[in-house]
Amino acid sequence: MLQLNPTPPAPGRWRTILENDFFPKNRRRDIDGLRGLAIALVVLFHAGWLKGGFIGVDVFVVISGYFMGRSALMQHPFQPVRFVCRRLYRLLPALLCMVALVSAGMLWWVLQSDRADIALNGAYALVYLSNIWASGHVGYFQGQAVAYPFLHTWSLSLEMQFYAIIFIMALLLPLTRHRRLVLSAIFSASAAYCAYAWHTGDSQAYYNILDRLWQFALGTMVWMLPRPKLPRAAADAVYAAAVAVIVGAGLFYPLSYACPSWMTVFPCGAVVLIIMLPDTRVGRWCLVPLSPLGVISYSVYLWHWPGIVVANYLLFFQVHGAMMAGVLALVMVVSLLSYVLVERTGLDYENRAPVAARNRGAALLVAACLGLAAVLAYISHVSRVH
């Protein structure tokens, strides 16, 4: 049976987590730092402090494609059950915990009309279809978005949908050259569709996986591209320029540059350059210091938006300034606890459990998500009827 330890880790385990997760010796910490930069951009955007911070999602998407290329398409032989279990233990426990706690804390006191939408959004989030719910209910950059604590899970739904595509590719296409051809086709078709959506002004393209597949595919194809052999000074210069492009986009991009705008090509291309240039001095100076934030970025992403939404509901006005800083500080504490007690515990169990127990645990996680989704869908239905 799956057992998640509810008690705080022993001091020895805290030490192990700090050493192995936050200061690893066998992982590129600059990529963790890039994830830290991306989550900082997103959080500051949602706090109203950075107008182009939405670009952090695009950065995350490319990085996600890169990691999926490594864990699925570049593994020979591909282990489908282990791949699925790893993803489920990585993602479901923290998501389930967040949706359950936020739902329990909000649904009993919000307005009945809000309760119906919030509960349904939570149900869609648990089955990774939140982007589909959002496209039919609210624009991401509209004012009413702040009323939905699970709206941010649209990007997690896109990610899981891409995982499903990669899973099918890894099963059906055993040869790398075939995978390269399919990824190139996906990249080209998605980029063309994205350009079409931008040209026609599709207001819901931001949530559409068809507009994002080229970004996922771009990150995945990094594994299939030759690594540039640049002199140290040239590599540092290119790396610094790439970091500057991402930071500049976060600082100065207007909302009109959000996906499907072609302007997202620049930060996405910058991510590829950073990934392809390991061990640079600029990376150690600029991104490695952000790596601890990158390690807990999933938990930060899960909790930061509900924290802002709940604060707005409780205070009856949109929080800003020092109040927002306090909310984000609390979010960071909750996120760290979520990482250590939930996210990390799930991965530890997946690593150590016997195969049969691991597979049963994954099935239980899926059943728990489906069960809670059914409860939330029922609450939404009852709230609308009455």
From Swiss-Prot:
It is a multi-pass membrane protein. It is an enzyme of class 2 (transferase). GO terms for biological process: cellulose biosynthetic process. It is found in: Cell inner membrane. InterPro entries: Acyl_transf_3_dom, Acyltransferase_3. The keyword Nuclease does not apply. Its EC number is 2.3.-.-. It comes from the Bacteria. Keywords: Acyltransferase, Cell inner membrane, Cell membrane, Cellulose biosynthesis, Membrane, Transferase, Transmembrane, Transmembrane helix. The keyword Protease does not apply. The chain crosses the membrane at residues 37-57, 91-111, 118-138, 156-176, 181-201, 237-257, 258-278, 290-310, 322-342, 362-382. One of its GO terms (molecular function) is acyltransferase activity, transferring groups other than amino-acyl groups. Pathway: Glycan metabolism; bacterial cellulose biosynthesis. GO terms for cellular component: plasma membrane. Belongs to the acyltransferase 3 family. May acylate a glucose moiety into cellulose fibrils, in cooperation with BcsABII and BcsCII. This is Putative membrane-bound transacylase BcsY. The gene is bcsY.
